Amino acid sequence: MDLFLYNTLSREKERFLPVNDPVKLYTCGPTVYDYAHIGNFRTYIFEDLLKRVLLFLGYSVYHVMNITDVDDKTLAGARKKGCSLEKYCQPYIHAFFADLETLHILKADAYPHATHYIPQMIEAIQQLINQGVAYIGQDQSVYFSISQFPNYGALSHLNLEELRNSARIDADEYDKDNLCDFVLWKAYDPDRDGEIFWESPFGKGRPGWHLECSIMSISLLGQSLDIHAGGVDNIFPHHENEIAQSESLSHKPFVRYWLHSHHLLVDRKKMSKSLGNFFTLRDLLDQGFSGEEVRYLLLQGHYRTQLNFTQEGLHASRQSLKRLRDFICRLEDPSYPDDIIHPEVATACQSFLETFITSLTNDLNISSSLAALFDFIRKINSSIDQHTGIQTETDSSVFSKQDAQHILALLRKIDQVLGVLPFSQPDIPEEVLLLVEQREAARKVKNWQEADRLRDEILSRSFAIEDGKTGMKVKKL
């Protein structure tokens, strides 16, 4: 099935036709000056969904996510704490990887650290100087001359002639009102940089943020990538500058598909520490929410729409996951009779799967996929309530254990994309299932003493039986 993705460069949905196998995917990772906040994780979960969909559709993927461990913010933090850059960044790097695990975000194939690629960055800067697209300024920093790159502004759709140009800027982050030559190498300033610098042919200093991503991606993925993803705030200047640097170095198109997720708002306001609406994942975990609940909330909206984050939304995510958990537990009930997979159940499963996948291939429309999932759950629950398969005029077969197992297999399949379904109950060993069946047989003939003995035997194997109006459930203790 063809995959269509919205390409920021063309402003159109395009059929995904990778030029590489495996697909070369680069995503902007954290700047490790602080704990990542939920706005960051909205982007990381969108990128995780993208990767999972590619894998689900049968593509091989080689994924690189960078770690920015040298920039204005990390240097300021290290200087304030009076420690080395590595010592300052390390706790935030560890926390980031722990957060990825909590949110069920698949690991990248490589996590390059900017500080490990300084020699390659220096070499690239020298190459750009030799080509005449970079120059040493009066402040001894090295700048990229945007006038030497005719396609500058194509990604962010800027008309350079209509914008006010400044001479140059050495800040890592700036807005479109300050369009100017950007820094490739920042000359050493002892008051600003303390003891942190690298030697180079241009003098002591450190690389600019934009150059770091270009060199790490080229070093690990080559000169032409299939997909580069990030947040909309990265379009300008960061990704615009990446294109200028990378294509000046290689003289080849840098990226085929650019994908960007929209902003996350908190109570319809921009997240900021001054407004008191700034949350890290740890803040939410401390409030009693789970990683799955946070993931579900950040996952459920389309990535190109603003997502409004609220406490009510988190509680709604909790209820959605409870509904999913209850459905899965119901399917795991071992009391269903042995029988065939009924054609009506198989047809319902196939119809749902086709809708689920079709939505995903339409620019990762996860909202429609989730709507299809809950509609499917409603239909299956209704059929179980009626003690039948999906009813037709000619077939009213009893819902079977095989029906349940077929649906569970389908849910496990789609969870390769969602990464959030609460399969809380592990596989039940065959010997425990045998004891459960023996207990059910004893109960049917009202041999309560034997039924109790078998219950105790099941308990001794760390499983419990819950008898309810809708049947019996087995749970791991």
UniProtKB/Swiss-Prot annotation:
Metal-binding as a keyword?
yes
Pfam families per the record?
A: CysS_C, DALR_2, tRNA-synt_1e
Q: Where is this motif: 'HIGH' region?
A: 30-40
Q: List the record's Gene Ontology CC terms alphabetically.
A: cytoplasm; cytosol
UniProt keyword terms in alphabetical order:
Aminoacyl-tRNA synthetase, ATP-binding, Cytoplasm, Ligase, Metal-binding, Nucleotide-binding, Protein biosynthesis, Zinc
User: What Gene3D superfamilies does the database record attribute to this sequence?
Assistant: Cysteine-tRNA ligase, C-terminal anti-codon recognition domain, HUPs
Its protein name is Cysteine--tRNA ligase
